[in-house]
Regions:
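C-terminal, flexible cofactor-proximal segment of oxidoreductases
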Residues: 270, 287-368
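Short hydrophobic core segments
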Residues: 7-9, 127-141, 169-171, 258-270
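A Rossmann-like FAD-binding core segment of flavoenzymes
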Residues: 188-282, 341-349
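N-terminal Rossmann-like FAD-binding beta1-loop-alpha1 element of flavoenzymes
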Residues: 4-31, 168-186
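A conserved short coil-to-beta-strand element within the FAD-binding core of flavoproteins
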Residues: 106-120, 233-245
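Helical element adjacent to the flavin cofactor pocket in flavoenzyme catalytic cores
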Residues: 86-104, 110, 138-142, 216-231
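Glycine-rich dinucleotide-binding loop and its adjacent helix/turn
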Residues: 85-88, 133-187, 193, 283-293, ...
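Glycine-rich active-site loop/strand segments that organize a redox cofactor
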Residues: 35-90, 194-210
């Protein structure tokens, strides 16, 4: 069995960003394993989907590019693009992995992690590895939330404009629902969105709750150009049936909607479906239980990183949010390993707003 001090599962933005930060904290012997290739989830985005956070090379002025995973990189600088496609962002991740000479083993699936005598045993397609620390960076894109018997999930669609039909029904009311609606409207089809709630007109300033300006602007432009998009709020779907070449969407209020095209399910993702999450973390009311250090409450030295981390009102679903935890966790590991503390390095991360050690500072308030 091959032993590594740090074992990171997932070679996406979180996994690679964490590895780079550990490297900067002089923590060696880090292995990253990925079931596909680097940036696997990004490569499977719909072709029209782009980052909703804009990239801009702000490095050097207190905050790196919002989509950067390391403080001295910038996708905007690399590609001269503001909103980046999934395939392009995966290319950025590959460039960064090469630049920092990260140890990444691709096309390697992890089936199980067990804790034996203070050491983690990680079962993979290529045998068992052992490790002292486990970082789960698998994200949620591989685990779509699809609670219905019929319907096509947003993540399963490669090109919206190639779908056949003159009318489509979308279940869901946030980013992916509006992205699907905007793209489908380009074909001239009539789009009906049904949702129990939406971030479209939320008063909350937090972009994890409120619909992003990028999507708001795209929606406004589409409607001004004649897009046929209808919004129905207060409709919670509980069942989708299919009979006589027609889909029926059943809502809690008794309303039934008929659709001749397969409904598009834009209900997000459910990371608790991940077998590794089930093995290593406690789940209560569909929420992963974490300590204030993003550590498992079941096992020591097992951390969750990336967009699936939640702490009360702090939702780390954007790269610029969750990357701020990398240095905090790297610092924690260095202390547990008895390594010398580099206060100047910590300060450099603080100066770049990439050292979030207090979740109580995450309230987003705007006066206007």
């Amino acid at each position: 069995m091959s032993h590594h001090r740090i074992f990171i599962i997932g070679a996406g933005a979180a996994g690679l960003g964490m590895a780079i930060t550990l490297q900067e904290f002089n923590i060696k012997d880090v292995l990253i394993v990925e079931k596909g290739t680097i940036g696997h989830s990004f490569k499977h985005w719909p072709l029209s989907t782009k980052t909703i956070t804009p990239s801009f090379t702000t490095n050097g002025f207190g905050m790196p590019d919002m989509n950067a995973i390391a403080k001295d990189t910038s996708p905007a600088f690399t590609f001269n693009e503001e909103h980046i496609s999934g395939k392009r962002y995966a290319e950025y991740l590959s460039l960064v992995a090469t630049h920092y000479n990260l140890n990444v083993k691709t096309n390697t699936n992890v089936s199980r992690v067990t804790y034996i005598d203070g050491v983690y045993h990680v079962s993979t397609d290529y045998g068992v590895y052992t490790a002292d620390y486990i970082f789960i960076a698998t994200g949620d894109y591989s685990f779509p939330y699809h609670p219905f018997s019929y319907g096509r999930h947003y993540s399963e669609i490669q090109t919206f404009t190639q779908l056949k039909g003159d009318a489509f029904t979308i279940i869901g009311g946030n980013e992916s629902a509006f992205d699907a609606a905007i793209n489908l409207s380009q074909t001239g089809a009539r789009i009906s969105i049904y949702t129990s709630k939406t971030g479209l007109k939320k008063e909350d300033a937090d972009p994890s709750i409120r619909l992003s300006p990028y999507t708001q602007q795209r929606l406004q432009n589409a409607i001004q150009e004649g897009a046929l998009i209808e919004m129905h709020v207060g409709y919670r779907a509980h069942k989708v049936t299919y009979q006589d070449h027609s889909y029926k969407i059943h809502f809690d209020n008794g309303h039934i909607v008929h659709s001749h095209t397969e409904p598009i399910i834009a209900t997000g993702f459910d990371v608790t479906q991940n077998p590794l999450i089930e093995q290593l973390f406690q789940i209560r009311q569909s929420e992963i239980q974490l300590t204030e250090l993003d550590e498992s409450t079941k096992f020591p030295n097992v951390f969750l990183i990336g967009a699936t981390v939640r702490h009360q009102n702090a939702i780390l679903c954007y790269i610029y949010k969750f990357r701020a935890r990398f240095a905090v966790l790297a610092h924690l590991v260095s202390l547990r390993e008895g390594l010398p503390e580099d206060t100047s390095l910590i300060q450099s991360y603080r100066q770049k707003n990439m050292y979030l050690d207090d979740y109580h500072c995450c309230d987003v308030n705007c006066t206007c």
